[in-house]
Swiss-Prot record:
PANTHER family: CYCLIN-D-BINDING MYB-LIKE TRANSCRIPTION FACTOR 1, REPLICATION TERMINATION FACTOR 1. The lineage of its organism: Eukaryota, Fungi, Dikarya, Ascomycota, Taphrinomycotina. One of its GO terms (cellular component) is nucleus. Residues 278-300, 336-359 bind DNA. It comes from Schizosaccharomyces pombe (strain 972 / ATCC 24843). It is found in: Nucleus. This is Replication termination factor 1.
Length: 466
C-alpha cells in the first residue's frame, strides 16, 4: 500500500482494484471495471487512457485541478486493472470550455428534477442559495450529476450559473436568458441558429471546414444570403447582429487570442503598410479582424498606459468630458476610445470603469428609498403609461421627486425592486408594474414610511402626487 501524498491502487478483488488519493477512495461512476470516471471528495473527475510507464506521481495535480486552477491539462498517473496482466495510465484533464446553450438545457433539466425530488418551489430553493455563499447540501448531488455528464466544466462555473438561473443578486452576468433582441444572445436563439446551420450544411453537402471558409468568402454570397434571411425570420435579432455573430463564431482563422512579441511586431508592420483595413490585416495575420483591431487599439496604439491613482483633476475632467460627449451625442453609446484620447494615457477600459464608479457613488450617496418611496416610484411609472421599460424617462421621475434621487438612482432602485420581489415571466411591462404595486401594498400600513411625505395617506390620491 502506498503512503500518503501518492496516487495509488489497492487490491480489492482478483478482477478489480480500487484507486486512492491520499487514502481517499476514488469512487467509480458506472461500471467499476470499465469506467474512467471517478468521484473524489464529492467531485467527479475523468481520466483518459495512455500507455503505462510504471511511474507513481503525487496527486497534488488532481487536487489543484479539482480546485479549479489546473493549467495545460496537468497530469497525474493512476492505476486501474483492465485485465489480468495489463495496466493503463490515465491523464486527468479539464478543458476551459465556454458555457453553451446545451449546458443551460442540461442544467435546467437537472434543476426541474431537483425541485420535484426535494419538494421545494423555485422561491424556496432561491432562498437557500441566497443565505450562504457556499453550496447548500441539497444542491450537491445536482452539481455532481451535471459534472458526470460534462466533466470538463468546473464546479465553480456550474455553481455560478446555478445562482444566475435563480437570479441571485451579484450573478447577473450568469443569468439564463432564453431570448434577447439586443445584447448577449439568448440560449434558445443560439440553439435555433446552430440547428438551422446544421441543416443548411447538410442540404448543401458542405463540410465544417468548407462552411467556415464560405462564411468569410465573397464567392458564395448568394448561398450565405439565403441562410442569413432564413435566420432573420426565425430569430428576433436584426440582420447585422446575426451577420456579426456568425462571423465571430464560425471563422477559419487558426490564431486565437494569445499574442507574442513577434505577433505584435507583425501587426505593427501590417498597420504601417495597410492602415486600418482590418479585414485585410486579419486575413494576412490569420486572425479575426476584430481581434487585430482590439489588440491594436487596447495595447499597442495607446503606448505606455498611466496606471497611477486618479487625481481629483482627472476625475473632474473625465466627468466633464463624458457629459460633453453625451450632450453632443444623446442617442449613441459612449465611444470610450474618444474619451480616452482626451484623457491622454488613460486606457479606455479604465476611463469607463472610473466613470461608472464615480456615478455609482453619487447614487449610493443619495437618500435611501423607503417602502412608501418605492410605492410612489411604481405609481409614477404607471402614470407615464409606456409600453416598455426602455421608454421610461428617468429624468422626469427625478424631477417629480424634486431631485431627491438622481435619474440613475431611480432606475437602479427599480431594478432592485424587481430582483427582490423576483419578477419574471409576466407578459407586458404594464402587468409587471401592476404586480409590483400590488405586492408592495400588501405590507402593513405602519411600514408605509416615505422621504417625500409624512405618511402613506398623504399620497394615497394619485392626482395629488405631482
Amino acid at each position: 500500500m502506498q503512503g500518503k501524498n501518492n496516487l495509488s491502487c489497492r487490491p480489492d478483488t482478483e478482477d478489480n482494484e480500487e484507486l486512492f488519493v491520499d487514502d481517499q477512495l476514488l469512487s467509480p461512476i458506472g461500471d467499476s471495471k470499465n469506467t474512467s470516471s471517478f468521484i473524489y471528495l464529492g467531485n467527479p473527475i475523468s481520466f483518459h487512457e495512455y500507455n503505462y510507464d510504471e511511474t507513481m506521481v503525487s496527486p497534488e495535480n488532481v487536487k489543484t485541478a479539482i480546485a479549479g486552477s489546473a493549467k495545460d491539462h496537468e497530469t497525474c498517473r493512476g492505476f486501474k486493472k483492465t485485465g489480468t496482466t495489463s495496466y493503463k495510465d490515465f491523464v486527468f484533464s479539464r478543458d476551459y470550455t465556454n458555457w453553451t446553450p446545451t449546458f443551460w438545457v442540461l442544467l435546467s433539466q437537472l434543476i426541474d428534477e431537483f425541485l420535484k425530488e426535494s419538494e421545494l418551489n423555485f422561491v424556496a430553493a432561491r432562498d437557500l442559495l441566497i443565505k450562504t455563499k457556499r453550496l447548500p447540501k441539497p444542491f450537491n448531488n445536482l452539481l455532481i450529476q451535471f459534472q458526470i455528464q460534462v466533466p470538463n466544466v468546473s464546479r465553480r462555473t456550474v455553481y455560478r450559473h446555478l445562482k444566475g438561473y435563480f437570479n441571485i443578486p451579484g450573478y447577473e452576468r450568469f443569468q439564463y436568458v432564453k431570448k434577447a433582441s439586443s445584447g448577449s444572445w439568448g440560449a434558445n436563439d443560439i440553439i435555433t441558429l446552430e440547428k438551422e446551420i446544421a441543416m443548411f450544411k447538410k442540404k448543401k453537402n458542405w463540410s465544417d471546414e468548407q462552411f467556415l471558409q464560405y462564411v468569410w468568402s465573397d464567392n458564395h454570397r448568394d448561398e450565405m444570403k439565403t441562410l442569413y434571411n432564413c435566420l432573420y425570420e426565425l430569430i428576433d435579432r436584426d440582420k447585422k447582429s446575426i451577420y456579426n455573430y456568425l462571423r465571430r463564431k464560425y471563422n477559419p482563422f487558426k490564431k486565437k487570442c494569445k499574442w507574442t512579441i513577434e505577433d505584435e511586431a507583425e501587426l505593427k508592420k501590417l498597420v504601417e503598410k495597410h492602415g486600418t483595413s482590418w479585414s485585410l490585416i486579419g486575413k494576412l495575420s490569420n486572425r479575426l479582424p476584430m481581434h487585430c483591431r482590439d489588440h491594436w487599439r487596447d495595447y499597442i496604439q495607446p503606448g505606455e498606459i498611466n496606471r497611477s491613482p486618479w487625481t481629483i483633476q482627472e476625475k473632474e475632467k473625465l466627468i466633464k468630458t463624458v457629459n460633453q460627449y453625451l450632450q453632443s451625442n444623446p442617442s449613441s453609446p459612449i465611444q470610450w476610445s474618444l474619451i480616452s484620447k482626451n484623457m491622454r494615457n488613460r486606457h479606455r477600459h479604465h476611463c469607463r470603469w472610473k466613470y461608472y464608479t464615480l456615478i455609482s457613488r453619487d447614487i449610493h450617496n443619495s437618500s435611501p428609498f423607503k417602502l412608501g418611496d418605492s410605492i410612489w416610484l411604481i405609481e409614477r411609472m404607471m402614470d407615464l403609461n409606456v409600453a416598455e421599460e426602455r421608454m421610461i424617462d428617468w429624468k422626469c421621475l427625478s424631477e417629480y421627486a424634486n431631485h431627491l434621487w438622481t435619474a440613475d438612482a431611480c432606475k437602479s432602485h427599480f431594478e432592485r425592486i424587481k430582483k427582490t420581489l423576483f419578477i419574471d415571466g409576466l407578459s407586458t411591462f404594464s402587468d409587471t408594474l401592476i404586480h409590483l404595486h400590488k405586492m408592495l401594498n400588501s405590507s402593513p400600513e405602519e411600514t408605509y414610511i416615505s422621504n417625500l411625505h409624512d405618511s402613506y395617506t398623504a399620497f394615497s390620491n394619485a392626482d395629488d402626487l405631482c
